[in-house]
Amino acid sequence: MKIGIIGAMEPEVAHLIAAMTNATSQTIAGIEFIAGTLAGKDVVVTRSGIGKVAASIATTLLIEKYAPDAMINTGSAGGFVDTLAIGDIVISSEVRHHDVDVTAFGYEIGQMAQQPAAFIPAAHLVEAANKAIAQLGEVKAIEGLICTGDSFICDPVRTQAMLKNFPTMAACEMEGAAIAQVCHQFGVPFVVIRSLSDNANNDSPVDFDSYIVKAGYHSALMVMLLLEQLNPSAVK
């Protein structure tokens, strides 16, 4: 079993890379891919860069060059659930684009043409993540809808508009749905795991800078615990 792991920023992958053994590195199109062992599993970790295009490029290259059996997207997110605090975790129950609108052609809001409205993570990856929750200590984790768009959300007016379209949204970020869409195209199972760095409000720019390292660590910890729970035979 080989697992691809993608984070957008250095703090979101640094703890994973530091914990790897037998690591080798290859750079393609300016993106570094680090292959090795993590939590007893063969993994390939990469920092994609920020946004949906960067994430799509990195995901496609990782799948084409390394043929992973599953993909994990890790990192930070803005939170929309009152019971979660900064540093807590959202495991994707589904992933959607929040900034796509081709409803004029009969699609749902957030649904890209010729794509599903929601991308559903692999059950065995979500199951492994849920088993890992018990080992998180004081860090809380829930399953929920994660929405993706090419904007950092810190405007309450925009937040309310997003919640009108996606009332069950638990978190928003800038890469997950793009990674999920590429995985859907290639038939690669995926899950998105995000730790909250802010609450998608006016304080978000300050909170993000203050808490990105904490969020990156918690998300990386969750990924490593997930890998420990993952059954090598439970793929595809």
From Swiss-Prot:
Record-annotated active site: 12 (proton acceptor), 198 (proton donor)
Keywords in alphabetical order: Amino-acid biosynthesis, Hydrolase, Methionine biosynthesis
Gene3D superfamilies with a match to the protein in the record: Nucleoside phosphorylase domain
Matching CDD domains: MTAN (cd09008)
Pfam family for this entry, one: PNP_UDP_1
GO molecular function: adenosylhomocysteine nucleosidase activity; methylthioadenosine nucleosidase activity
Keyword hit for Amino-acid biosynthesis: yes
Domain of life: Bacteria
Main function: Catalyzes the irreversible cleavage of the glycosidic bond in both 5'-methylthioadenosine (MTA) and S-adenosylhomocysteine (SAH/AdoHcy) to adenine and the corresponding thioribose, 5'-methylthioribose and S-ribosylhomocysteine, respectively. Also cleaves 5'-deoxyadenosine, a toxic by-product of radical S-adenosylmethionine (SAM) enzymes, into 5-deoxyribose and adenine.
Protein name (record): 5'-methylthioadenosine/S-adenosylhomocysteine nucleosidase
